[in-house]
Amino acid sequence: MKIIFFFALLAIAACSASAQFDAVTQVYRQYQLQPHLMLQQQMLSPCGEFVRQQCSTVATPFFQSPVFQLRNCQVMQQQCCQQLRMIAQQSHCQAISSVQAIVQQLRLQQFASVYFDQSQAQAQAMLALNMPSICGIYPSYNTAPCSIPTVGGIWY
């Protein structure tokens, strides 16, 4: 009886490990097939940080002056705008999606156990959507608007 139980447990563990391996392999293949998306996300990390911080003095730690925070925000915004300008016109929606993905990833990493603020997520999503116009980058008139989902399931 113990042997049967042991083999059943071993079979379950093997199936679970196989499923996890398949999932990891699928993600790896996806990134292999789309290396430009990973590169784009890396390029847009200043945008993700800018959006995540929302560059408000409310988020300023007590040991940083508001002037330092403003200067830091200006630098991040300039870096973000430079990176957005490097992205081809037809992929601006992808760029915005990448910024949103970065923001969501940062939130999951840093605030996994803290209360999630829906209004802050919406404000970040709106800021991410407006980054191209903040940078003075406007799509051509025949370009369709972007539709970006947020964590709360709201589309912009």
UniProtKB/Swiss-Prot annotation:
Compartment(s): Vacuole, Aleurone grain
Gene3D superfamilies the UniProt entry points to: Plant lipid-transfer and hydrophobic proteins
Top-rank taxon: Eukaryota
Main subcellular localisation: other
InterPro entries the UniProt entry points to: Bifun_inhib/LTP/seed_sf (IPR036312), Bifunc_inhib/LTP/seed_store (IPR016140), Glia_glutenin (IPR001954)
UniProt GO molecular function: nutrient reservoir activity
UniProt KW Signal keyword: yes
Modified residues (Pyrrolidone carboxylic acid): Q20
Signal sequence residues: 1-19
Keyword Nucleotide-binding listed: no
Keyword annotations of the record: Pyrrolidone carboxylic acid, Seed storage protein, Signal, Storage protein, Vacuole
Cellular component GO terms held in the UniProt record: aleurone grain; vacuole
Pfam families: Gliadin (PF13016)
Function: Seed storage protein; serves as a source of nitrogen, carbon and sulfur for the young developing seedling.
Family, per entry: Belongs to the prolamin family.
Extra remark beyond the main annotation: Lacks significant tandem repetitive sequences.
Listed name of the protein: Prolamin PPROL 17D
Species this protein is from: Oryza sativa subsp. japonica
